[in-house]
């Protein structure tokens, strides 16, 4: 294929992509007094610590249309990925930017993918996009193959804290406080509509790990790729990697620290797990 670029907002947790022209478009996390831009300069650990002490509201802000247009550049075909449109305006902004860029240069092709997810599931989609772009000369076939693949990717998450979700109104403050006091971990998934869907609650790391592994199999996991992002919880990420590889020796499993936006939602101790079915 001719010149191409892969673009994603920073919910993908990637800053670079080996062997590809890749651009990350930062979201930001804001409180009434501070703003954290989710780019290469962000100290994620410092942000997490600050937000834990924040008593007022906090929220995320998506890239604007101009940010997306700048990331798309002036030439070449583009595949772009956004955090789920159910949680952010990033997808809508990217679609307007696509329209503007294609009007300026009708020969260009830009495909904007609403991930209906975040973090590790987007990472899987980006990896697949790179594979398809290298394998096909036809842009439409790449987009079609990517759409087919997306139907077989999933995201699970385990939250040790729901402080930030309470501060931005996504869960009640009472529920977040009770979960913290009782040591309860909330387990959920990205639904087919791209919303946060709670699946259950567990007390203790072992039960949370077993719950996630059971859900993976229930959703059709048979040994495909797994990407695990963690917020200050490398130990649980490693335990998950080890157990998955013990059960599925051929599985391609990798773990890594989450960047800013996903750390904002996952919080300290949180895990986000993307996988293929």
Predicted region positions:
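Generic enzyme active-site microenvironment
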Residues: 7
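A glycine-rich beta-strand to alpha-helix segment
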Residues: 82, 111-112
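Rossmann-fold dehydrogenase core element
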Residues: 106
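Class I S-adenosyl-L-methionine
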Residues: 34-103
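Mixed-charge interfacial surface used for oligomerization/domain docking
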Residues: 2-3, 11-29, 33-34, 87-90, ...
């Amino acid at each position: 294929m001719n010149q191409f670029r892969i673009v994603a907002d920073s919910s993908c947790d990637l800053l670079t992509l080996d062997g590809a022209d890749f651009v990350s478009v930062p979201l930001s996390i804001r409180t009434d007094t501070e703003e954290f831009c989710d780019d290469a300069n962000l100290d994620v650990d410092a942000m997490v610590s600050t937000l834990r002490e924040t008593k007022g509201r906090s929220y995320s802000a998506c890239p604007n249309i101009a940010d997306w247009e700048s990331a798309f550049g002036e030439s070449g075909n583009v595949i772009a990925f956004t955090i789920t449109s159910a949680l952010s305006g990033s997808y809508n902004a990217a679609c307007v930017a696509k329209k503007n860029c294609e009007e300026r240069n009708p020969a260009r092709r830009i495909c904007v993918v609403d991930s209906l997810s975040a973090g590790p599931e987007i990472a899987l989609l980006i990896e697949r996009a790179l594979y398809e772009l290298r394998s096909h000369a036809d842009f439409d076939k790449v987009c079609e193959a990517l759409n087919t693949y997306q139907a077989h990717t999933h995201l699970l998450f385990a939250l040790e804290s729901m402080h930030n979700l309470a501060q931005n109104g996504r869960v009640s403050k009472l529920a977040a406080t009770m979960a913290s006091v009782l040591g309860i971990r909330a387990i959920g998934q990205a639904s087919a509509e791209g919303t946060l869907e709670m699946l259950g609650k567990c007390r203790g790391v072992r039960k949370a790990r077993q719950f996630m592994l059971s859900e993976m199999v229930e959703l059709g996991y048979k040994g495909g790729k797994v990407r695990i992002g963690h917020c200050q919880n490398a130990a649980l990420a490693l335990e998950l990697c080890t157990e998955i590889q013990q059960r599925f020796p051929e599985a391609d499993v990798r773990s890594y620290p989450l960047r800013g936006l996903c750390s904002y939602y996952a919080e300290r101790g949180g895990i986000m797990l993307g996988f293929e079915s």
